[in-house]
Amino acid sequence: MKFSELWLREWVNPAISSDDLAHQITMAGLEVDGVDAVAGEFNGVVVGHVVECGQHPNADKLRVTKIDVGGDRLLDIVCGAPNCRQGLKVAVATVGAVLPGDFKIKAAKLRGESSEGMLCSFSELAISDDHDGIIELPADAPIGVDVREYLHLDDKTIEISVTPNRADCLGIIGVARDVAVVNQLPLTEPDMAEVVASINDTLPIRVDAPQACPRYLGRVVKGINVKAATPLWMREKLRRCGIRSIDPVVDVTNFVLLELGQPMHAFDLDRISGGVIVRLATEGEELTLLDGTKVKLNADTLVIADHQKPLAMAGIFGGEHSGVNEETRNVLLESAFFNPLSITGRARRHGLHTDASHRYERGVDPALQHKAIERATRLLIDICGGEAGPVVDVTTASELPKQATITLRREKLDRLIGHHIPSEQVSDILRRLGCKVTECGSDWQAVAPSWRFDMAIEEDLVEEVARIYGYNNIPDVPVRADLVMTKHREASLSLKRVKTALVDRGYQEAITYSFVDPKVQALLHPQQEALILPNPISVDMSAMRLSLLTGLLSAVVYNQNRQQSRLRLFESGLRFVPDNTADLGIRQDVMLAGVIAGHRYDEHWDLARQPIDFYDLKGDLEAILELTGKLSDVQFRAEAHSALHPGQSAAIYLAGEHIGFIGVVHPELERKLDLNGRTVVFEVQWNKLADRAVPQAREISRFPANRRDIAVVVAENVPAEDILAECKKVGANQVVGVNLFDVYRGKGVAEGYKSLAISLVLQDTARTLEEEEIAATVAKCVEALKQRFQASLRD
């Protein structure tokens, strides 16, 4: 926001320099981006009166004038401006004046006529870019007075960055409040007294959407002269704020917008049919805006309409049909409070961003509308004439924002600031900020002012007290930290350790968005409902992820499209699952996921080009599970998963509890996602693995180990893992190692069966095992396999 320093000083005028004022505003939390002079450096320019203006005898486009500048005689000045005429008050650069750019004015002859000065335009004084003609000063401008003094050009424009929470500072009044509070000065408001109605004319107003528009004020003003000139003082204030003067009606509404931060709009009363209705648009309803753009409205867009058609997008942009023009004689002034949620996003949807929408989206003071409409009425009548009717007020009090009541505890204040501020000073700061304060012992209860939407919790009051007290007034105290050795649980396995292990195995960590494409996610999880964002960044980022794989697989496609054929990626992060039993109906699980694609090894002269398979990723995952000390409790069970290949996937169980899955991406899904070649994925719940099993010390046997090999024939559907587990269970005291070293199908083995060759390593910690004991243990294993799996020894 840009504003004039002198305009600000009309409200509050601290006895400090411009630079100090800018620094003070920054320290109050409103960062100053720039301070610039409103005009160039010049001198010797005074107010003059055009006494005579005639045609130059030797030039069609020049005029010869006689100018009264309050001296002993009239000055002869040649001027080429098309708007130069007799009776005009102008800015005259006399002989000896120095204009911006070190341009010195000297007496000269132009086409044979003497010229003793120059009549100046705004651009020649570096006030603005307007060079269409000379400056036209008000008729009551005193002759001979320095133009710099008369136009208050020893002024500066201050531009500040207003954070979204400080919408109250999108008007001079908000900045002035902060400056007044910091300097402990009163606020001098301009006259905003009620304008007594001189006519009884009103227009019926109906609000059909009170939640979106809790307050709507309308006032009829009749008999105005739109062709009246906007006063120079108002045009200058608007210009210094970066607003171009258009006509007096628009200028008045813009002036009130900049002064109070309240957007206003003026409708041509004679173009409104029946009355005003504030309602939601019907889907596809069309409106032609003031700039001639045609828009199709959505059903959630608030409009100001009459009994036949929409007139304006509420709080955003006026309509062309009801706009004020040169023929307008009667207007309806609008001053309203629109709920920020009813305005947010609607302007962007149509490629718009207006001063009004900028303020309404952030929030306007709901107590400001009466003050604004009275101020605008008075200014409009003073400039354009006319008669005002009574204000029609349609307010739904229950829908207006409620002022927050906040308790501030002394203990919290001192702890967060780290400095003790006297209680009387705290109370004074809160009251000067506009809060209604009740002192409760050492604490305070404060009711936030209507213009401060950002005051909602105790920390907000702490921030305000510290801000006004001055961060620079809080003494620097070295932080005292007692070094206490933290306890480290041996059972804790950090996620960082696991990430390091994956990096060591050739993986790269990926970080993807928690917002994913709902269409892609539906392919991976067709049976699960996801959380859909009401205001997404984009359509393809509108769902919260149910799995890390949605983002990881998109990353694989992205990299493959950029000539990366061999990929090893992993990611850790939250998934968001709708769950009525969880807090806020959302369960958040920390997940660890990985994906591999391409060849097993980088291209090498001594290595064959082998594509990755299921067991490559399973081996990497088992290495991670080994770190947890729980690998022996983990089972990989063949279970169907809609996103995975039915014959090359498995569910992962830990001590009987499902914790994840692993497998090759389903060929159909691979095609739909545009994956290039076989892709293998895994995902596990990290919370189930974060506590590792601490290894227990045990004695290493000094006695020889004995190996015995057996080959058993079992049905094809019997998992080898179950066979090995049964052998470990039966020979628990003596079998120290079990390994599957061969799988055979073919001659000698019936169809539907397979032969598993298993090595059993037997050892005792106290003695050397006898052959009879070894044979007995092996026989027990074979018998157990026969009983449970109908296994038989292979001949």
Swiss-Prot record:
Residues 39-148 form the tRNA-binding domain. Gene3D superfamilies: 3.30.56.10, Bira Bifunctional Protein, Domain 2 (3.30.930.10), Ferrodoxin-fold anticodon-binding domain (3.30.70.380), Nucleic acid-binding proteins (2.40.50.140), Phenylalanyl-trna Synthetase, Chain B, domain 3 (3.50.40.10). Binds 2 magnesium ions per tetramer. One of its GO terms (cellular component) is phenylalanine-tRNA ligase complex. Residues 401-476 form the B5 domain. Residues 701-794 form the FDX-ACB domain. Mg(2+) binds at residues 454, 460, 463-464. Its EC number is 6.1.1.20. InterPro entries: aa-tRNA-synth_II/BPL/LPL, B3/B4_tRNA-bd, DNA-bd_dom_put_sf, Fdx_antiC-bd, Fdx_antiC-bd_sf, NA-bd_OB-fold, Phe-tRNA-ligase_IIc_bsu, Phe-tRNA-ligase_IIc_bsu_bact. One of its GO terms (biological process) is phenylalanyl-tRNA aminoacylation. Its cofactor is Mg(2+). Its main location: cytoplasm. GO terms for molecular function: ATP binding; magnesium ion binding; phenylalanine-tRNA ligase activity; tRNA binding. The keyword Magnesium applies. It catalyses: tRNA(Phe) + L-phenylalanine + ATP = L-phenylalanyl-tRNA(Phe) + AMP + diphosphate + H(+). The keyword Membrane does not apply. Keywords: Aminoacyl-tRNA synthetase, ATP-binding, Cytoplasm, Ligase, Magnesium, Metal-binding, Nucleotide-binding, Protein biosynthesis, RNA-binding, tRNA-binding. It is found in: Cytoplasm. Tetramer of two alpha and two beta subunits. PANTHER family: PHENYLALANINE--TRNA LIGASE BETA SUBUNIT, PHENYLALANYL-TRNA SYNTHETASE BETA CHAIN AND LEUCINE-RICH REPEAT-CONTAINING PROTEIN 47. Belongs to the phenylalanyl-tRNA synthetase beta subunit family. Type 1 subfamily. This is Phenylalanine--tRNA ligase beta subunit. It comes from Yersinia pseudotuberculosis serotype I (strain IP32953). The lineage of its organism: Bacteria, Pseudomonadati, Pseudomonadota, Gammaproteobacteria, Enterobacterales. The gene is pheT.
